[in-house]
Amino acid sequence: MLIKSEYKPRMLPKEEQVKKPMTSNGRISFVLMAMAVLFACLIARGLYLQTVTYNFLKEQGDNRIVRTQALPATRGTVSDRNGAVLALSAPTESLFAVPKDMKEMPSAAQLERLSELVDVPVDVLRNKLEQKGKSFIWIKRQLDPKVAEEVKALGLENFVFEKELKRHYPMGNLFAHVIGFTDIDGKGQEGLELSLEDSLYGEDGAEVVLRDRQGNIVDSLDSPRNKAPQNGKDIILSLDQRIQTLAYEELNKAVEYHQAKAGTVVVLDARTGEILALANTPAYDPNRPGRADSEQRRNRAVTDMIEPGSAIKPFVIAKALDAGKTDLNERLNTQPYKIGPSPVRDTHVYPSLDVRGIMQKSSNVGTSKLSARFGAEEMYDFYHELGIGVRMHSGFPGETAGLLRNWRRWRPIEQATMSFGYGLQLSLLQLARAYTALTHDGVLLPLSFEKQAVAPQGKRIFKESTAREVRNLMVSVTEPGGTGTAGAVDGFDVGAKTGTARKFVNGRYADNKHVATFIGFAPAKNPRVIVAVTIDEPTAHGYYGGVVAGPPFKKIMGGSLNILGISPTKPLTAAAVKTPS
Protein backbone atom coordinates (compact mmCIF):
# COMPACT_ATOMS: atom_id res chain seq x y z
CA MET A 1 0.00 0.00 0.00
CA LEU A 2 1.44 3.27 -1.03
CA ILE A 3 1.48 6.00 1.56
CA LYS A 4 1.28 9.66 0.26
CA SER A 5 3.69 11.96 2.09
CA GLU A 6 2.53 15.44 3.12
CA TYR A 7 6.14 16.80 3.70
CA LYS A 8 7.09 20.01 1.93
CA PRO A 9 10.67 21.23 2.21
CA ARG A 10 11.03 24.79 3.68
CA MET A 11 12.77 27.27 1.39
CA LEU A 12 15.64 29.28 2.93
CA PRO A 13 15.40 33.06 2.54
CA LYS A 14 17.41 34.58 -0.29
CA GLU A 15 20.68 35.95 1.00
CA GLU A 16 21.32 39.68 0.42
CA GLN A 17 24.23 40.29 -1.87
CA VAL A 18 27.12 42.28 -0.41
CA LYS A 19 29.27 44.41 -2.72
CA LYS A 20 32.87 43.49 -2.76
CA PRO A 21 35.20 46.29 -1.70
CA MET A 22 37.34 47.92 -4.37
CA THR A 23 40.70 46.33 -4.55
CA SER A 24 43.92 48.32 -4.36
CA ASN A 25 44.36 47.78 -8.06
CA GLY A 26 41.03 49.48 -8.61
CA ARG A 27 41.96 52.51 -6.60
CA ILE A 28 45.21 52.89 -8.43
CA SER A 29 43.43 52.70 -11.73
CA PHE A 30 41.01 55.43 -10.65
CA VAL A 31 43.79 57.78 -9.52
CA LEU A 32 45.74 57.21 -12.69
CA MET A 33 42.69 57.99 -14.77
CA ALA A 34 42.08 61.22 -12.81
CA MET A 35 45.70 62.27 -13.20
CA ALA A 36 45.59 61.53 -16.87
CA VAL A 37 42.55 63.75 -17.28
CA LEU A 38 44.18 66.56 -15.25
CA PHE A 39 47.42 66.26 -17.16
CA ALA A 40 45.52 66.43 -20.42
CA CYS A 41 43.83 69.63 -19.21
CA LEU A 42 47.18 71.15 -18.31
CA ILE A 43 48.60 70.28 -21.70
CA ALA A 44 45.58 71.78 -23.36
CA ARG A 45 45.93 74.95 -21.25
CA GLY A 46 49.62 75.19 -22.02
CA LEU A 47 48.96 74.80 -25.73
CA TYR A 48 46.31 77.52 -25.46
CA LEU A 49 48.67 79.91 -23.68
CA GLN A 50 51.50 79.16 -26.10
CA THR A 51 49.41 79.74 -29.15
CA VAL A 52 46.29 81.80 -28.71
CA THR A 53 47.40 84.25 -25.93
CA TYR A 54 51.21 84.05 -26.12
CA ASN A 55 51.81 87.50 -27.55
CA PHE A 56 49.41 89.19 -25.14
CA LEU A 57 50.89 87.54 -22.03
CA LYS A 58 54.46 88.16 -23.12
CA GLU A 59 53.76 91.84 -23.60
CA GLN A 60 52.12 92.09 -20.16
CA GLY A 61 54.97 90.20 -18.47
CA ASP A 62 57.60 92.35 -20.11
CA ASN A 63 55.84 95.49 -19.07
CA ARG A 64 55.32 94.62 -15.40
CA ILE A 65 58.06 93.95 -12.85
CA VAL A 66 57.67 93.08 -9.18
CA ARG A 67 59.92 95.22 -6.98
CA THR A 68 60.38 95.75 -3.27
CA GLN A 69 60.24 99.48 -2.76
CA ALA A 70 61.85 101.10 0.27
CA LEU A 71 59.58 103.30 2.35
CA PRO A 72 62.05 105.66 4.01
CA ALA A 73 61.29 106.77 7.53
CA THR A 74 61.02 110.52 7.83
CA ARG A 75 63.98 111.77 9.85
CA GLY A 76 62.96 113.81 12.86
CA THR A 77 62.77 117.57 12.56
CA VAL A 78 65.19 119.69 14.60
CA SER A 79 63.92 123.05 15.85
CA ASP A 80 65.06 125.74 18.24
CA ARG A 81 63.42 126.38 21.61
CA ASN A 82 60.79 128.64 20.00
CA GLY A 83 59.88 126.34 17.11
CA ALA A 84 62.10 127.75 14.36
CA VAL A 85 62.99 124.82 12.08
CA LEU A 86 66.73 124.19 11.85
CA ALA A 87 66.76 120.82 10.04
CA LEU A 88 64.04 118.94 8.18
CA SER A 89 63.62 116.22 5.56
CA ALA A 90 61.71 116.94 2.35
CA PRO A 91 60.48 114.46 -0.31
CA THR A 92 62.64 114.10 -3.39
CA GLU A 93 63.16 111.60 -6.19
CA SER A 94 66.26 109.70 -7.22
CA LEU A 95 66.86 108.10 -10.61
CA PHE A 96 68.22 104.61 -11.23
CA ALA A 97 68.46 102.40 -14.30
CA VAL A 98 68.00 98.67 -14.96
CA PRO A 99 70.66 97.88 -17.62
CA LYS A 100 69.86 94.16 -17.49
CA ASP A 101 66.40 94.74 -18.99
CA MET A 102 67.45 97.28 -21.61
CA LYS A 103 66.90 96.08 -25.17
CA GLU A 104 68.62 99.11 -26.62
CA MET A 105 70.49 102.16 -25.39
CA PRO A 106 68.79 105.55 -25.30
CA SER A 107 69.46 107.62 -28.38
CA ALA A 108 72.40 110.00 -28.51
CA ALA A 109 70.01 112.94 -28.23
CA GLN A 110 68.32 111.42 -25.18
CA LEU A 111 71.65 110.77 -23.46
CA GLU A 112 72.82 114.29 -24.20
CA ARG A 113 69.67 115.80 -22.72
CA LEU A 114 69.77 113.46 -19.71
CA SER A 115 73.39 114.45 -19.12
CA GLU A 116 72.42 118.12 -19.08
CA LEU A 117 69.54 117.56 -16.68
CA VAL A 118 71.29 115.38 -14.10
CA ASP A 119 74.75 116.95 -14.48
CA VAL A 120 76.47 113.65 -15.24
CA PRO A 121 78.83 113.39 -18.25
CA VAL A 122 77.53 111.43 -21.24
CA ASP A 123 80.43 108.96 -21.17
CA VAL A 124 79.75 108.24 -17.48
CA LEU A 125 76.07 107.60 -18.26
CA ARG A 126 76.98 105.32 -21.14
CA ASN A 127 79.40 103.33 -18.98
CA LYS A 128 76.68 102.83 -16.37
CA LEU A 129 74.11 101.67 -18.89
CA GLU A 130 76.51 99.24 -20.60
CA GLN A 131 76.79 97.17 -17.41
CA LYS A 132 74.24 94.66 -18.70
CA GLY A 133 74.61 92.29 -15.80
CA LYS A 134 73.23 94.83 -13.35
CA SER A 135 69.58 95.15 -12.44
CA PHE A 136 70.15 98.37 -10.44
CA ILE A 137 72.51 101.29 -10.84
CA TRP A 138 72.12 104.85 -9.61
CA ILE A 139 72.07 107.60 -12.22
CA LYS A 140 71.49 110.60 -9.94
CA ARG A 141 70.12 110.90 -6.44
CA GLN A 142 67.95 113.55 -4.85
CA LEU A 143 66.96 115.43 -7.98
CA ASP A 144 65.32 118.82 -7.94
CA PRO A 145 61.54 118.29 -8.54
CA LYS A 146 61.59 120.30 -11.78
CA VAL A 147 64.53 118.31 -13.09
CA ALA A 148 62.79 115.04 -12.21
CA GLU A 149 59.74 116.06 -14.26
CA GLU A 150 61.90 116.92 -17.27
CA VAL A 151 63.67 113.56 -17.04
CA LYS A 152 60.31 111.78 -16.92
CA ALA A 153 59.27 113.65 -20.06
CA LEU A 154 62.13 111.98 -21.97
CA GLY A 155 60.20 108.67 -21.78
CA LEU A 156 63.28 106.54 -21.16
CA GLU A 157 62.61 102.81 -20.77
CA ASN A 158 64.05 100.99 -17.75
CA PHE A 159 64.81 104.24 -15.97
CA VAL A 160 63.05 104.25 -12.61
CA PHE A 161 62.40 106.96 -10.02
CA GLU A 162 62.74 106.09 -6.36
CA LYS A 163 61.17 108.26 -3.66
CA GLU A 164 63.68 109.47 -1.07
CA LEU A 165 64.03 112.18 1.55
CA LYS A 166 66.61 114.93 1.42
CA ARG A 167 67.86 116.80 4.48
CA HIS A 168 67.57 120.59 4.39
CA TYR A 169 69.06 123.22 6.70
CA PRO A 170 67.02 126.42 6.29
CA MET A 171 69.42 128.56 8.34
CA GLY A 172 72.46 127.62 6.26
CA ASN A 173 75.79 128.14 8.00
CA LEU A 174 74.22 129.83 11.05
CA PHE A 175 73.88 126.56 13.00
CA ALA A 176 76.35 124.47 11.00
CA HIS A 177 78.67 123.48 13.85
CA VAL A 178 75.84 122.60 16.21
CA ILE A 179 73.44 120.77 13.90
CA GLY A 180 76.06 119.19 11.63
CA PHE A 181 74.80 117.32 8.57
CA THR A 182 73.80 113.92 7.17
CA ASP A 183 75.15 111.94 4.24
CA ILE A 184 73.09 111.29 1.11
CA ASP A 185 71.52 108.24 2.79
CA GLY A 186 70.23 110.40 5.65
CA LYS A 187 72.69 109.18 8.29
CA GLY A 188 74.16 111.75 10.69
CA GLN A 189 77.82 112.59 10.05
CA GLU A 190 78.60 115.49 12.38
CA GLY A 191 77.11 117.60 15.17
CA LEU A 192 73.76 116.78 16.71
CA GLU A 193 72.77 114.93 13.54
CA LEU A 194 75.37 112.36 14.58
CA SER A 195 75.06 112.44 18.36
CA LEU A 196 71.24 112.15 18.21
CA GLU A 197 71.22 109.67 15.32
CA ASP A 198 69.31 106.95 17.17
CA SER A 199 66.49 109.33 18.05
CA LEU A 200 66.30 111.18 14.74
CA TYR A 201 66.59 108.36 12.20
CA GLY A 202 63.61 106.09 12.89
CA GLU A 203 63.19 102.81 10.97
CA ASP A 204 62.61 102.37 7.22
CA GLY A 205 59.67 100.37 5.90
CA ALA A 206 59.11 98.38 2.68
CA GLU A 207 56.36 97.73 0.13
CA VAL A 208 56.15 95.15 -2.66
CA VAL A 209 54.87 96.83 -5.83
CA LEU A 210 54.28 96.12 -9.50
CA ARG A 211 55.96 98.54 -11.89
CA ASP A 212 55.61 99.04 -15.63
CA ARG A 213 58.57 99.47 -17.96
CA GLN A 214 58.66 103.21 -17.31
CA GLY A 215 59.03 102.57 -13.60
CA ASN A 216 55.53 103.69 -12.73
CA ILE A 217 53.84 101.79 -9.92
CA VAL A 218 50.74 100.10 -11.31
CA ASP A 219 49.77 98.09 -8.25
CA SER A 220 50.68 97.38 -4.63
CA LEU A 221 50.91 93.73 -3.67
CA ASP A 222 50.13 91.97 -0.42
CA SER A 223 53.32 90.51 1.00
CA PRO A 224 54.82 89.57 4.36
CA ARG A 225 57.67 91.89 3.38
CA ASN A 226 55.40 94.93 3.56
CA LYS A 227 56.22 97.08 6.60
CA ALA A 228 55.21 100.60 7.55
CA PRO A 229 58.07 103.03 8.32
CA GLN A 230 58.61 104.29 11.86
CA ASN A 231 59.42 107.99 11.67
CA GLY A 232 62.21 109.55 13.73
CA LYS A 233 61.69 111.66 16.83
CA ASP A 234 61.38 115.44 16.54
CA ILE A 235 63.96 117.25 18.68
CA ILE A 236 63.51 120.64 20.34
CA LEU A 237 66.86 122.23 21.12
CA SER A 238 67.78 124.70 23.83
CA LEU A 239 69.20 127.01 21.18
CA ASP A 240 67.54 130.33 20.41
CA GLN A 241 67.73 131.31 16.76
CA ARG A 242 67.55 135.02 17.62
CA ILE A 243 70.51 134.86 20.01
CA GLN A 244 72.43 132.57 17.65
CA THR A 245 72.01 135.08 14.81
CA LEU A 246 73.19 137.93 17.01
CA ALA A 247 76.19 135.97 18.29
CA TYR A 248 77.24 134.79 14.83
CA GLU A 249 77.03 138.26 13.29
CA GLU A 250 78.96 140.00 16.08
CA LEU A 251 81.61 137.28 16.11
CA ASN A 252 82.20 137.67 12.37
CA LYS A 253 82.49 141.44 12.72
CA ALA A 254 85.12 141.08 15.45
CA VAL A 255 87.16 138.48 13.55
CA GLU A 256 87.13 140.66 10.44
CA TYR A 257 87.99 143.87 12.31
CA HIS A 258 90.92 142.32 14.15
CA GLN A 259 91.99 140.28 11.10
CA ALA A 260 91.96 137.18 13.27
CA LYS A 261 92.35 133.54 12.32
CA ALA A 262 89.08 132.40 13.91
CA GLY A 263 86.56 133.07 16.65
CA THR A 264 84.10 131.29 18.91
CA VAL A 265 81.17 132.31 21.09
CA VAL A 266 79.06 130.36 23.59
CA VAL A 267 75.90 131.65 25.27
CA LEU A 268 74.38 129.74 28.21
CA ASP A 269 71.29 130.02 30.36
CA ALA A 270 72.98 130.71 33.70
CA ARG A 271 70.19 129.02 35.67
CA THR A 272 69.83 125.74 33.75
CA GLY A 273 73.01 125.14 31.76
CA GLU A 274 71.02 125.16 28.52
CA ILE A 275 73.08 126.24 25.52
CA LEU A 276 71.34 129.22 23.93
CA ALA A 277 73.91 129.82 21.19
CA LEU A 278 77.16 128.32 19.94
CA ALA A 279 78.89 129.79 16.91
CA ASN A 280 82.27 129.53 15.22
CA THR A 281 83.89 131.35 12.37
CA PRO A 282 84.95 130.32 9.78
CA ALA A 283 81.81 128.27 9.14
CA TYR A 284 80.26 126.34 6.24
CA ASP A 285 76.92 125.54 4.62
CA PRO A 286 75.65 122.12 5.85
CA ASN A 287 73.52 121.89 2.70
CA ARG A 288 76.83 121.56 0.78
CA PRO A 289 79.30 120.07 3.28
CA GLY A 290 81.53 118.69 0.55
CA ARG A 291 82.60 122.19 -0.38
CA ALA A 292 83.97 122.94 3.11
CA ASP A 293 87.52 122.25 4.28
CA SER A 294 88.52 120.96 7.71
CA GLU A 295 89.11 124.46 9.10
CA GLN A 296 85.56 125.51 8.25
CA ARG A 297 83.96 122.34 9.58
CA ARG A 298 85.82 122.27 12.90
CA ASN A 299 83.60 122.95 15.91
CA ARG A 300 86.21 124.97 17.78
CA ALA A 301 84.02 125.55 20.83
CA VAL A 302 84.13 121.80 21.51
CA THR A 303 87.32 120.50 19.90
CA ASP A 304 89.90 123.25 20.39
CA MET A 305 91.81 123.58 23.65
CA ILE A 306 92.75 127.04 24.86
CA GLU A 307 94.77 128.25 27.80
CA PRO A 308 92.20 130.45 29.54
CA GLY A 309 94.60 133.06 30.84
CA SER A 310 93.13 135.33 33.49
CA ALA A 311 89.62 133.96 32.91
CA ILE A 312 90.54 131.21 35.42
CA LYS A 313 91.39 133.65 38.25
CA PRO A 314 87.85 134.01 39.71
CA PHE A 315 87.90 130.32 40.61
CA VAL A 316 91.21 130.54 42.46
CA ILE A 317 89.96 133.56 44.40
CA ALA A 318 86.68 131.76 45.11
CA LYS A 319 88.52 128.71 46.45
CA ALA A 320 90.63 130.84 48.79
CA LEU A 321 87.56 132.66 50.11
CA ASP A 322 85.56 129.44 50.41
CA ALA A 323 88.31 127.73 52.42
CA GLY A 324 88.86 130.74 54.69
CA LYS A 325 92.39 131.25 53.37
CA THR A 326 91.68 134.94 52.81
CA ASP A 327 88.94 137.53 53.24
CA LEU A 328 87.85 140.72 51.54
CA ASN A 329 89.86 142.89 53.93
CA GLU A 330 93.27 141.26 53.44
CA ARG A 331 95.87 143.13 51.39
CA LEU A 332 98.57 141.12 49.66
CA ASN A 333 102.01 142.22 48.54
CA THR A 334 101.67 142.19 44.76
CA GLN A 335 105.15 143.27 43.76
CA PRO A 336 107.01 140.95 41.36
CA TYR A 337 108.68 137.91 42.92
CA LYS A 338 110.37 134.68 41.88
CA ILE A 339 109.65 130.99 42.32
CA GLY A 340 113.09 129.50 41.85
CA PRO A 341 114.54 131.16 38.75
CA SER A 342 111.10 131.98 37.28
CA PRO A 343 109.62 135.48 37.76
CA VAL A 344 105.96 136.13 38.56
CA ARG A 345 104.81 139.64 37.70
CA ASP A 346 101.88 141.74 36.52
CA THR A 347 101.52 143.96 33.47
CA HIS A 348 101.59 146.93 35.85
CA VAL A 349 103.32 146.93 39.22
CA TYR A 350 101.00 147.34 42.21
CA PRO A 351 102.67 147.47 45.67
CA SER A 352 99.69 145.81 47.30
CA LEU A 353 96.09 144.90 46.48
CA ASP A 354 93.12 143.59 48.40
CA VAL A 355 91.08 140.71 46.98
CA ARG A 356 88.80 143.07 45.08
CA GLY A 357 91.84 144.78 43.59
CA ILE A 358 93.38 141.43 42.60
CA MET A 359 90.20 140.66 40.66
CA GLN A 360 89.78 144.11 39.14
CA LYS A 361 93.41 144.56 38.08
CA SER A 362 93.80 140.88 37.14
CA SER A 363 96.91 140.43 39.27
CA ASN A 364 98.99 137.36 38.49
CA VAL A 365 101.05 137.95 41.63
CA GLY A 366 98.06 138.15 43.94
CA THR A 367 96.28 135.14 42.43
CA SER A 368 99.41 132.97 42.50
CA LYS A 369 99.96 133.78 46.19
CA LEU A 370 96.38 132.71 46.99
CA SER A 371 96.93 129.46 45.07
CA ALA A 372 100.15 128.83 47.02
CA ARG A 373 98.10 128.57 50.21
CA PHE A 374 96.93 125.15 49.00
CA GLY A 375 98.89 122.02 48.22
CA ALA A 376 99.44 120.96 44.61
CA GLU A 377 97.21 117.92 44.99
CA GLU A 378 94.39 120.04 46.41
CA MET A 379 94.58 122.49 43.50
CA TYR A 380 94.67 119.61 41.03
CA ASP A 381 91.51 118.13 42.56
CA PHE A 382 89.87 121.55 42.46
CA TYR A 383 90.56 122.12 38.76
CA HIS A 384 89.37 118.59 38.06
CA GLU A 385 86.10 119.28 39.91
CA LEU A 386 85.54 122.29 37.66
CA GLY A 387 85.68 119.92 34.66
CA ILE A 388 89.18 120.58 33.38
CA GLY A 389 90.61 117.37 31.96
CA VAL A 390 87.17 115.73 32.06
CA ARG A 391 85.17 114.93 28.93
CA MET A 392 81.65 116.40 28.91
CA HIS A 393 80.24 113.61 26.68
CA SER A 394 78.43 116.07 24.46
CA GLY A 395 78.37 113.51 21.65
CA PHE A 396 80.25 115.82 19.28
CA PRO A 397 83.03 114.21 17.25
CA GLY A 398 86.45 115.33 18.43
CA GLU A 399 85.26 116.68 21.78
CA THR A 400 88.26 117.49 23.94
CA ALA A 401 88.57 116.71 27.63
CA GLY A 402 91.07 119.50 28.07
CA LEU A 403 94.51 119.06 29.58
CA LEU A 404 95.39 118.88 33.26
CA ARG A 405 98.62 117.08 34.08
CA ASN A 406 98.87 115.03 37.25
CA TRP A 407 99.99 117.19 40.18
CA ARG A 408 102.98 114.92 40.86
CA ARG A 409 104.50 116.13 37.58
CA TRP A 410 104.12 119.83 38.29
CA ARG A 411 107.27 121.93 38.47
CA PRO A 412 107.39 124.50 41.33
CA ILE A 413 106.41 127.37 39.01
CA GLU A 414 103.44 125.54 37.46
CA GLN A 415 101.04 125.82 40.37
CA ALA A 416 101.53 129.58 40.11
CA THR A 417 101.13 129.79 36.32
CA MET A 418 98.00 127.62 36.39
CA SER A 419 96.40 130.10 38.78
CA PHE A 420 96.52 132.71 36.01
CA GLY A 421 95.65 130.35 33.16
CA TYR A 422 98.90 128.90 31.80
CA GLY A 423 99.75 125.19 31.93
CA LEU A 424 96.17 123.91 31.83
CA GLN A 425 93.86 123.80 28.83
CA LEU A 426 90.15 123.43 28.17
CA SER A 427 87.59 124.19 25.48
CA LEU A 428 85.55 127.39 25.51
CA LEU A 429 82.44 125.29 26.18
CA GLN A 430 84.15 123.79 29.25
CA LEU A 431 85.14 127.25 30.46
CA ALA A 432 81.58 128.55 30.04
CA ARG A 433 80.27 125.55 31.95
CA ALA A 434 82.72 126.17 34.81
CA TYR A 435 81.21 129.64 35.22
CA THR A 436 77.85 128.08 36.13
CA ALA A 437 79.46 127.25 39.49
CA LEU A 438 79.53 131.00 40.10
CA THR A 439 76.19 131.95 38.54
CA HIS A 440 74.23 129.07 40.11
CA ASP A 441 75.26 129.89 43.67
CA GLY A 442 78.17 127.48 43.86
CA VAL A 443 76.66 124.53 41.96
CA LEU A 444 78.34 123.36 38.73
CA LEU A 445 75.63 122.50 36.17
CA PRO A 446 75.66 119.95 33.35
CA LEU A 447 75.21 121.50 29.90
CA SER A 448 72.47 120.57 27.48
CA PHE A 449 71.69 121.22 23.81
CA GLU A 450 68.10 120.10 24.38
CA LYS A 451 65.38 122.17 26.00
CA GLN A 452 65.00 121.16 29.65
CA ALA A 453 61.61 120.65 31.29
CA VAL A 454 63.07 120.68 34.81
CA ALA A 455 66.18 122.22 36.33
CA PRO A 456 69.12 119.77 36.24
CA GLN A 457 70.95 118.46 39.29
CA GLY A 458 74.43 119.87 39.59
CA LYS A 459 77.50 119.41 41.77
CA ARG A 460 78.34 121.83 44.58
CA ILE A 461 81.79 123.40 44.28
CA PHE A 462 81.49 126.49 46.53
CA LYS A 463 79.25 127.67 49.33
CA GLU A 464 76.36 129.84 48.15
CA SER A 465 77.73 132.84 50.02
CA THR A 466 81.12 132.45 48.33
CA ALA A 467 79.60 132.39 44.84
CA ARG A 468 77.64 135.57 45.55
CA GLU A 469 80.71 137.27 47.00
CA VAL A 470 82.81 136.45 43.94
CA ARG A 471 80.07 137.59 41.55
CA ASN A 472 80.08 140.95 43.31
CA LEU A 473 83.88 141.17 43.02
CA MET A 474 83.68 140.43 39.29
CA VAL A 475 81.44 143.44 38.66
CA SER A 476 84.49 145.61 39.41
CA VAL A 477 86.15 144.25 36.24
CA THR A 478 83.62 146.06 34.01
CA GLU A 479 83.57 149.22 36.12
CA PRO A 480 86.00 152.14 35.71
CA GLY A 481 89.49 150.98 36.63
CA GLY A 482 88.86 147.37 35.60
CA THR A 483 90.36 145.48 32.67
CA GLY A 484 86.96 144.74 31.11
CA THR A 485 85.20 148.08 30.76
CA ALA A 486 84.68 147.36 27.05
CA GLY A 487 82.24 144.64 28.08
CA ALA A 488 80.03 146.81 30.29
CA VAL A 489 76.33 146.70 29.35
CA ASP A 490 74.29 149.79 30.10
CA GLY A 491 71.50 149.19 32.60
CA PHE A 492 73.04 146.04 34.08
CA ASP A 493 75.70 145.05 36.58
CA VAL A 494 77.90 142.71 34.57
CA GLY A 495 80.33 140.33 36.25
CA ALA A 496 83.15 139.40 33.90
CA LYS A 497 86.78 138.45 33.45
CA THR A 498 89.19 139.09 30.63
CA GLY A 499 91.83 136.65 29.47
CA THR A 500 94.88 137.11 27.25
CA ALA A 501 97.09 134.12 26.59
CA ARG A 502 100.10 133.67 24.35
CA LYS A 503 99.81 130.61 22.13
CA PHE A 504 102.13 127.66 22.62
CA VAL A 505 103.78 127.08 19.23
CA ASN A 506 106.62 124.67 18.43
CA GLY A 507 107.48 124.05 22.06
CA ARG A 508 107.48 127.66 23.22
CA TYR A 509 105.11 130.56 23.89
CA ALA A 510 104.95 132.82 20.84
CA ASP A 511 105.31 136.56 21.35
CA ASN A 512 103.05 137.48 18.42
CA LYS A 513 100.23 134.92 18.62
CA HIS A 514 97.50 135.35 21.22
CA VAL A 515 94.06 134.13 22.20
CA ALA A 516 91.83 136.93 23.49
CA THR A 517 89.01 135.86 25.82
CA PHE A 518 86.13 137.65 27.51
CA ILE A 519 83.61 135.80 29.66
CA GLY A 520 80.94 137.04 32.01
CA PHE A 521 77.35 137.01 33.21
CA ALA A 522 74.44 139.34 33.90
CA PRO A 523 72.58 140.53 35.89
CA ALA A 524 75.31 139.95 38.47
CA LYS A 525 73.02 139.52 41.50
CA ASN A 526 70.70 137.07 39.76
CA PRO A 527 72.51 135.84 36.62
CA ARG A 528 70.40 134.82 33.64
CA VAL A 529 72.97 134.69 30.84
CA ILE A 530 76.61 133.63 30.48
CA VAL A 531 78.51 134.77 27.38
CA ALA A 532 82.01 133.56 26.47
CA VAL A 533 83.97 134.90 23.49
CA THR A 534 87.41 133.99 22.14
CA ILE A 535 89.21 135.56 19.21
CA ASP A 536 92.09 133.45 17.92
CA GLU A 537 95.26 135.20 16.71
CA PRO A 538 94.07 138.80 16.30
CA THR A 539 96.59 140.71 14.19
CA ALA A 540 95.08 144.21 14.05
CA HIS A 541 93.75 146.74 16.57
CA GLY A 542 95.15 145.05 19.67
CA TYR A 543 95.29 141.58 21.15
CA TYR A 544 94.21 141.91 24.81
CA GLY A 545 91.05 140.09 25.86
CA GLY A 546 89.31 143.25 27.05
CA VAL A 547 90.11 145.18 23.87
CA VAL A 548 89.44 142.44 21.31
CA ALA A 549 86.77 140.17 22.82
CA GLY A 550 85.12 142.80 25.06
CA PRO A 551 83.14 144.66 22.35
CA PRO A 552 81.48 141.56 20.84
CA PHE A 553 80.75 140.34 24.38
CA LYS A 554 79.01 143.64 25.12
CA LYS A 555 76.81 143.43 21.99
CA ILE A 556 75.95 139.76 22.48
CA MET A 557 75.23 140.10 26.20
CA GLY A 558 73.14 143.25 25.77
CA GLY A 559 71.19 141.78 22.86
CA SER A 560 70.59 138.48 24.65
CA LEU A 561 69.21 140.19 27.75
CA ASN A 562 66.91 142.24 25.54
CA ILE A 563 65.73 139.21 23.53
CA LEU A 564 64.93 137.31 26.73
CA GLY A 565 62.98 140.27 28.08
CA ILE A 566 65.18 140.79 31.15
CA SER A 567 64.61 144.20 32.71
CA PRO A 568 67.56 146.50 33.50
CA THR A 569 68.78 146.35 37.08
CA LYS A 570 70.08 149.90 37.26
CA PRO A 571 69.29 153.23 35.57
CA LEU A 572 70.30 153.64 31.96
CA THR A 573 72.82 156.33 31.10
CA ALA A 574 71.68 159.28 29.03
CA ALA A 575 73.53 157.95 25.98
CA ALA A 576 71.63 154.67 26.13
CA VAL A 577 68.17 156.21 26.38
CA LYS A 578 66.62 156.48 22.92
CA THR A 579 64.26 159.36 22.33
CA PRO A 580 61.21 158.37 20.21
CA SER A 581 61.23 159.98 16.80
Curated annotation (Swiss-Prot):
First-level EC class: hydrolase
Membrane topology value: Single-pass membrane protein
Main localization, broad class: membrane
Glycoprotein recorded as keyword: no
Gene Ontology CC terms, in alphabetical order: plasma membrane
EC number: 3.4.16.4
Phenotype upon changing P552V: In strain: CDC84-060418
GO-annotated biological processes: cell wall organization; division septum assembly; FtsZ-dependent cytokinesis; peptidoglycan biosynthetic process; proteolysis; regulation of cell shape; response to antibiotic
Catalytic activity, reaction form: Preferential cleavage: (Ac)2-L-Lys-D-Ala-|-D-Ala. Also transpeptidation of peptidyl-alanyl moieties that are N-acyl substituents of D-alanine
Annotated Pfam families: PBP_dimer (PF03717), Transpeptidase (PF00905)
Residues the record marks as active site: S310
Ranges annotated as spanning the membrane: 28-48
Pathway where it operates: Cell wall biogenesis; peptidoglycan biosynthesis
Assigned keywords, A-Z: Antibiotic resistance, Carboxypeptidase, Cell cycle, Cell division, Cell inner membrane, Cell membrane, Cell shape, Cell wall biogenesis/degradation, Hydrolase, Membrane, Peptidoglycan synthesis, Protease, Septation, Transmembrane, Transmembrane helix
Source species, domain of life: Bacteria
Disulphide connectivity of cysteines: none
Cell compartment(s), UniProt: Cell inner membrane
Reported function: Catalyzes cross-linking of the peptidoglycan cell wall at the division septum.
Comment, domains: The enzyme has an N-terminal penicillin insensitive transglycosylase domain (formation of linear glycan strands) and a C-terminal penicillin-sensitive transpeptidase domain (cross-linking of the peptide subunits).
Additional comment: This protein was sequenced in penicillin-sensitive strains LM306, and FA19, and in penicillin-resistant strains CDC84-060384, CDC84-060418 and CDC77-124615. The sequence shown is that of strain LM306.
UniProt-listed PANTHER family: PEPTIDOGLYCAN D,D-TRANSPEPTIDASE, PEPTIDOGLYCAN D,D-TRANSPEPTIDASE FTSI
Family statement drawn from the similarity comment of this UniProt entry: Belongs to the transpeptidase family. FtsI subfamily.
Protein name (Swiss-Prot/TrEMBL): Probable peptidoglycan D,D-transpeptidase PenA
Gene source species: Neisseria gonorrhoeae
Taxonomic lineage: Bacteria, Pseudomonadati, Pseudomonadota, Betaproteobacteria, Neisseriales
Name of the encoding gene: penA
